[in-house]
Amino acid sequence: MKEIAVVILNWNGIELLKKFIPNTVNYSKEANIYVIDNFSSDGSVEFLKTNHPNINVIELDKNYGFAEGYNRGLKNVNEEIYCLLNSDIEVTENWLEPIIKEFNNINTSIAQPIILDYNNKEKFEYAGAAGGFIDKYGYPFCRGRVLNSIENNINQYKDSKIFWAT
């Protein structure tokens, strides 16, 4: 089995960490968990070090924003697979198993679970839905969402190829 890292970028997100990190820790036993801290001033780093000493905290020297923050932090992560997880995501039991299984296929370079709306678990999440595609004109679109219309999840997009992940 390949080594996997769950990597979360944080900036002043202590309340999100308090709410969502416990499930991430409990349901990610097969992974090493990292939090890249983008120079928070809200006590996030202290909270993690005190309450979750098994989480690897990578402290950046300033707020580099989303992409550069991840890129700088990932230089300190040595696992073979990176699972980039937003700090406001609630993971569920066994969430990593299908992702790990998919990465055992040498032709897989990216994978995304179906992302459901936090407040309405029957619907896809607006921004990520179920992965995405590029149409023939070069426009990106999500499976599970057409403009502002969000579909219910009835497993219609289970195990299908995607062009991009969120």
Tell me what each language-model feature is.
Residues 82:
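Short aromatic/hydrophobic "clamp" motif used to bind/position activated sugar donors
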Residues 14, 23, 37-46, 62:
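A conserved acidic beta->alpha catalytic loop
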Residues 139-142, 147-166:
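A recurrent flexible, glycine/aromatic-enriched loop bordering the glycosyltransferase active site
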Residues 90-139:
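Conserved donor NDP-sugar-binding/catalytic core segment of glycosyltransferases
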Residues 60-77, 87:
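Glycine-rich, basic loop-to-helix element that forms the pyrophosphate-binding segment
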